[in-house]
Amino acid sequence: GKYSKSIELYKKALSFDPNNATIINNLAKAYFDIGELKIAEKYCLEALKINPNDGNIQKILSLIYLRQQNYKVGWHYFDGRLNLSDFVEKNSSINLIRKKLFFGNKLKKDSKILVLREQGVGDEILYGTMYKDLFNKCENVTIECDKRLKNLFCNSFPEYKNSFVNLGEISNDKNLLSNYEIVLYAGSLGKYFRTKSAHFENNNYLYPDENSLNKAKEKLK
């Protein structure tokens, strides 16, 4: 198959350039894609030794550990995505908020926290499963969201509906941003609230507005 061919080519390239972290990481990714997680981990750690600050390597390593259900270590490396060029390009406010990005292991109850959505509506809905945990733990939370999802989030968390604002409303405004102590991207909430398999509940958490739902149903008739 194509993966066998890729692995063969990467190994050949590696024989000419054995300390090339990019080739080693590509090899790790190929093994990850075919489910050979232990081999993928071995190559990824090798690449990380050569280039410890490479976001691509950290991201692949995080996916390996998350797939292995080694959640604490997986989420730790998941923050590597914040340094990737495609992540930076799609998040225009990252240079404004970078100094406030939080990488600590514990969230304080009274910290003023701004949460930014991840790329894409699908990711935003996925990581939104942790918003309830965050609201329960911390008192001062504001969440920026895609404007298409704002009403849905407000309806799903009625007691916290004032905590949701449109994307960029705060993160693109230096003055408003100064009111917040720390900033987190939604995907980074995993290291605080999803560190065991038992933390992943299969419950519905999104509830559309009844009027909007009825109107949509009428249109489909």
Identify the role of each PLM range.
Residues 1-221:
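Alpha-helical solenoid repeat scaffolds of the TPR/TPR-like class and their adjacent stem/linker regions
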